Amino acid sequence: LTQQGREEGIRRLMSINLLKRLESSVYSFRLTVDRIRKLIDGTIQTINNYQSGGCVLNLTEISDDEDFDYDDQNTDLFSVGKKVKIDLADMDYVSWKRELEKDAENLELLSLMIADITPEHDTKLQTLFDLIRKKIEHPINPGNRKLLIFTAFSDTADYLYANVSKFAKEKFGLNTAEVTGVVEGKTTIPKLRADLNTVLTCFSPISKGKDILLPGSSAEIDILIGTDCISEGQN
C-alpha cells in the first residue's frame, strides 16, 4: 500500500463517515462538520505559527481526543495518522495550507446549507413524530404504547431525546428515556436513576421483573431511545 493509496483511502473513509452521519441525522452531520472544521483551522494555525517562527508539527497537539465525540473516535477517519510528528520543513506546507483552506471553505458552505434545518424543518424528525402519533393512537395490541428507537450514533440519540421526549410528554403524557453507553442515561421521570438496567426495567417491567427489582415504583417508560448498547447482554 503506497502513501498515495493510503491517503486516498482516508479521503474515502472521510466521505463515507460524513454520509453515514448525514443519513443518521442532520444534527450529527452538523457536529462532525464542525469538528473537522475545527481540526483544519487548528492545523492552518500551526502552519501559520511555523511560518512565523518555525516549529515541529505534532498532530497530537492539533486535536486532542476530547475534541471528538465517542462516535467519531471509533471511526478510521480520526484514528489514522494522529500520533505522527511532522517537521514542516520536510514537506510542501504552502500547498498543504492552500488545500486546507479550500476544505475549510467547503465545510463552511456545508454548515451554511444546513443551518436552517431546525427540528421544525427536519423532515425525518417530523416523519418520526407522525409514526409515534399513529402508534399511540392506533396500537397493534390494545394498550401497547411501547416504542424502541435505535440509532447508530449517540449524537443522534441526544437529538432525538431532546425532541421526542418533549413531543411525547406534551401530546400524550408519555415518559421517554435515552441510553447510549457513553454517558449517564436520561429520562423524563423525575428522580429515577437513568442507568441501563433501571431504564430497561421500567421500559419492560414484566420481562425484567420490575415488581421485584423496584417494588412500589409506578414509574414506567414508554419510549426508549438508544444505541446498540441496549442489546448487550440482553435476550
Residue ranges with predicted function:
Residues 190-215:
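Surface-exposed acidic, glycine/proline-enriched linker/cap segments
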